[in-house]
Structures are given as C-alpha cells and as structure tokens.
A protein has these predicted regions:
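C-terminal motif of bacterial Sec signal peptides marking the signal peptidase cleavage site
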Residues: 21-24
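A short, solvent-exposed beta-strand micro-motif common in secreted/extracellular proteins
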Residues: 90-109
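Structured interaction patches on ligand/partner-binding surfaces of diverse proteins
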Residues: 103-137
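Extracellular carbohydrate-recognition regions
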Residues: 136-170, 294-295
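Extra-cytoplasmic beta-strand recognition segments
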Residues: 154, 207-232, 263, 300
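Short carbohydrate-recognition loop motifs
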Residues: 169-205
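Extracellular carbohydrate recognition and processing domains
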Residues: 242-275, 290-291
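Extracellular carbohydrate recognition
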Residues: 286-303
Length: 305
C-alpha cells in the first residue's frame, strides 16, 4: 500500500497576479521566451519513528518559489504516471524552494503549504532554458522544533483513547498482527478499530490525556489516517474555569481506502482564549442503512511549534 510516498504527473495551477504580489516578487528577463524545465518524481516524508511517528503523508501539491517569490502551485494527480515537468521562466543560478502542500481539513479548496514540513531548498540552482533537469524523488521532514503533543499508532496494547460513559462499544486494536484491514507499513502492524452493530450502535471516545492550550494564533494540527464505511465525527472538549464545551470540527466521509487528513485545531481553540486545556473526541452512530460498521483510524498526531 502506498499513501503519500509517491505522487506523480501533476498539473499546473495558475495563480492570480495578486497572490504572487502578496507573497513576493520574482524578477525575470521579460524577453526570455524559452522556459527551463524541472521534473519531480515525488515527495517522501522522512521521520524519526520513536519521536515523530510513522511517515504517512498526503502531499497533494508543491509550492514553488524562485528567489523567494512564488512562481506557482503545482498539483499532483490521484494516479501514478511519469515524472512531472514544470516550466519556469528563469536562466542561470537562482534560489529554488519547493514547499510540500496539503489539503487543509481535507478540503480541495483550502490547499496550503504544510507549516511543519521543511521546504526543499536549492540555494544556487542553475536553470538552463530548453532543457529538462530531473530532481528525482525529493524528501522532506518535520522541522526539528516541532512538538508532538500526542502520538497514537496502536502499536502498543495500551490505547490512549478511552470510551465515554454512554458509549456502547470501545476502540480496540486490529487482530491478528498485520491484519490486512490495518494500516500496514514498516512501523505499523496494528490500527484502531471501532465496530458498530445493531445492538451496539453508538460510539464515543476521548483522548485519555488533556492537552495544554497554546498561545492564541498558534497553528495546532491534528493528523490522522482513516478508513471507514460509516461517518465519524471529530471534535474537541474544551475546558475552561467554569464549563466544558464540546465543539465538532468535521465529519470523516466514507472511504474504502486509507486516507490521510490534516485538521486545523488552532483556529478553533483560539476562539477560547481563557480555556485551560482540551481533549479530542470521536463520535459515531450506526447509519440507518447499515447492519454493521467498521471504522479504522491510525497514526494520530497533534503537532505544533
């Protein structure tokens, strides 16, 4: 199974001049008519597993900068194909920067460079018009100062998600080891699974630990993988001095393949500057047209700087 390790043959998304002006200005010779081309085979995420979790990622596009000016956003398609080529009007040595991009909250219209993946930088890239210069497969990693507030990959028997008092069922590990339903990789042999049945049709669970609030404006991201035939709601339980506030963030749609999602927690938590801490909550009810449901999740991370 491949998820986020190779992404090929993307299309060029043109940006408005106003966006370029807002992010920097790249100056080039207006008389140049023949572009230089670079080809990219894909982008891999490299992690130090004990501290950063698995290397699952869903890098859907790249943000390309020349001399700190945004050139454009180049989208990877769903299917694998030949290495992609991008035209750039540049000649000679320039700084080339490639930032890995994601779909924020899983929405195609909210694409952003992921702030916790390091950009790939070539300080003096020699652009040669009329040629294709192959960069091959690129590799990114988390910034060294990224903080991992929560890591749950279900590889240990103890699970850091506890059932709510009203829940009919609990999340458990897939069995046996390397069950084909699980998210399988070099560091992943198990996943978390929630089974709903007609007589056990409601699930609720929260992270065992509470997480400290950060300075308002801090970008706090929840990463996770999922595969499900039943809707799963993700939210936060926010505790302040007097009350606990439950706030839904989004609903995960059905998917018969493993998907990766990046959820912006910070924008929601910043609405409660007096809050003390928060937990992540998971909720699901058996859909009326189903006799049973199978909800799988894995590689949960809370990350911030």
């Amino acid at each position: 199974m491949r998820l986020g390790s190779k992404l090929y043959n993307f299309k060029f998304i043109l940006l408005f001049v106003s966006l370029v002006a807002a992010t920097g200005c790249y100056k080039f010779d207006s008389s140049q008519t023949v572009p230089a081309y670079i080809s990219v085979d894909g982008i891999n995420l490299d992690t130090y597993y004990p501290e950063e979790g698995t290397n699952s990622a869903d890098i859907v596009d790249i943000w390309v900068y020349v001399d700190d000016g945004l050139i454009g956003v180049f989208e990877f398609p769903e299917s694998d194909s030949l290495p992609a080529t991008l035209p750039i009007i540049a000649e000679g040595k320039h700084k080339l920067e490639i930032r890995p991009g994601i779909k924020l909250n899983g929405i195609s219209s909210t694409r952003v460079p992921y702030p916790y993946y390091k950009p790939i930088i070539f300080e003096e890239f020699d652009f040669i018009p009329g040629t294709v210069q192959a960069l091959g497969e690129l590799t990114t990693s988390y910034y060294p100062d990224v903080i991992f507030g929560w890591l749950e990959d279900f590889e240990q028997p103890e699970i850091s998600i506890e059932s709510a008092s009203w829940s009919d069922t609990a999340i458990i590990r897939t069995q046996p080891e390397n069950n084909p339903d699980a998210f399988l990789s070099s560091n992943s042999r198990y996943s978390g699974v929630i089974d709903l049945l007609s007589d056990k049709d409601e699930y609720g669970g929260t992270s065992h630990n509470s997480f400290e609030m950060q300075t308002p404006g801090t970008v706090i991201m929840l990463e996770m993988n999922f595969k499900t035939n039943n809707y799963l709601t993700l939210g936060v339980l926010i505790r302040d001095t007097y009350d606990i506030i439950e706030k839904d963030l989004l609903i995960l749609n059905h998917s018969d393949e493993w998907k990766k999602i990046y959820i912006n927690l910070g924008s929601n938590l910043s609405l409660y500057p007096q809050a003390i801490d928060y937990k992540i909550i998971f909720r699901a009810g058996l859909e009326s047209e189903l006799s049973d449901a199978h909800i799988l999740i894995d590689n949960i991370k809370i990350v911030y700087r």
